Amino acid sequence: MDSFFSTYVWPAIIMIGQSLLLLVCLLVFIAYVLLADRKIWAAVQLRRGPNVVGPFGLFQSFADLLKFVFKEPIIPAGANKAVFLLAPLVTVLLALSTWAVVPLADGWVIANINVGILYIFAISSLEVYGIIMGGWASNSKYPFLGALRSAAQMVSYEVSIGFVIVTVLLCVGSLNLTDIVNAQHTGLGTMLGLPASFLDWHWLSLFPMFIIFFISALAETNRPPFDLPEAESELVAGFMVEYGSSPYMMFMLGEYAAVCLMCALTTILFLGGWLPPVDIWILNWVPGIIWFTLKACFVFFMFAMVKAFVPRYRYDQLMRLGWKVFLPLSLAMVVIVAFVLKLMGWA
């Protein structure tokens, strides 16, 4: 009995506790990411943004949470009630479940599986089903058109993201996210005789793929300038037209969880994860999770600045960019990187 408890029960309890702790921390982080998004946009437009609830508006997201929770959900007449309510739940659960394999620091991961990046790519591909379900179950043409646009957009840019990931995997030789970060201890900088620093990270040696991944991440998460499925001037509010209260909150939560995931993936694949920018003793004292969080926040700041400055694309421009520019460019980079690795004997 004791061996059964120590072998199965206790590890399960620890994993559940870790999952709950990560979930709570992630939800709080998303609340402040949402606030930061509004604050940055307001600052660019010379406004103050949310500043009433709490000091500097720090509790605005929690006030919005209470507002959504206590509002009555309204289901349209003729809608498929079960699918209508299931769609936002599917979206948010899939978006949150991907974080189980994301290493926040060395050893700070719930499931350190050897196919971590493949797991994230597979789960992220399933998120489009929640959007399609929500648009179809609303029994309205505008949400359905918005859902179709969103599905086409996400599928289009997943191909480019997949090729970018393949390029990184060719350089690292592993699907494990921790191995991808550790492989960035040495890189282009050390080959040139420089000390270990941010010049070794993949953003420099794979710079074209870094740009493609960043722009594709914007499109994958329906962020501006690729927010066509939700653009007020395009299709009212996309697939979320008929949603309100808690179901709408779940869609927003899933969207920002996916945005945070893309920031974390950019950090892991190209910005060295939890590695300090320069390998010196004083920076190595800083916990890895601090470096990881700072890098992810920097990537999100870039997301927010793109939202503030770049005008929205037309739908045909969006599709042309994905299929006629990013797809051939990323495919060519895969071939070039594989050729260089084989030629130099690094494969």
From Swiss-Prot:
Translocase found in the keyword field: yes
Q: Does the keyword Transit peptide apply?
A: no
Q: Where does the record place a coiled coil?
A: none
InterPro entries under this entry?
NADH_UbQ_OxRdtase_su1/FPO, NADH_UbQ_OxRdtase_su1_CS
Q: How does it assemble?
A: NDH-1 is composed of 14 different subunits. Subunits NuoA, H, J, K, L, M, N constitute the membrane sector of the complex.
| Functional summary from the UniProt entry | NDH-1 shuttles electrons from NADH, via FMN and iron-sulfur (Fe-S) centers, to quinones in the respiratory chain. The immediate electron acceptor for the enzyme in this species is believed to be ubiquinone. Couples the redox reaction to proton translocation (for every two electrons transferred, four hydrogen ions are translocated across the cytoplasmic membrane), and thus conserves the redox energy in a proton gradient. This subunit may bind ubiquinone.
Just give the chief location class: membrane
Q: What class of enzyme is it?
A: translocase
- What gene name is given for the protein in this entry? nuoH
Q: Name one GO cellular component term.
A: plasma membrane
Checking PROSITE patterns in the record gives: COMPLEX1_ND1_2 (PS00668)
Organism domain of life: Bacteria
Query: GO terms for molecular function, please?
Result: NADH dehydrogenase activity; oxidoreductase activity, acting on NAD(P)H, quinone or similar compound as acceptor; quinone binding
Native organism is Rhizobium johnstonii (strain DSM 114642 / LMG 32736 / 3841)
Segments passing through the bilayer: 13-33, 50-70, 82-102, 115-135, 161-181, 198-218, 263-283, 286-306, 321-341
Which reaction equations make up its catalytic activity?
A: a quinone + NADH + 5 H(+)(in) = a quinol + NAD(+) + 4 H(+)(out)
Which family is this protein grouped under? Belongs to the complex I subunit 1 family.
Query: How the protein sits in the membrane?
Result: Multi-pass membrane protein
GO aspect biological process, one term = aerobic respiration
Kindly provide the name given to this protein in its UniProt entry.
Answer: NADH-quinone oxidoreductase subunit H
Q: What is its EC number?
A: 7.1.1.-
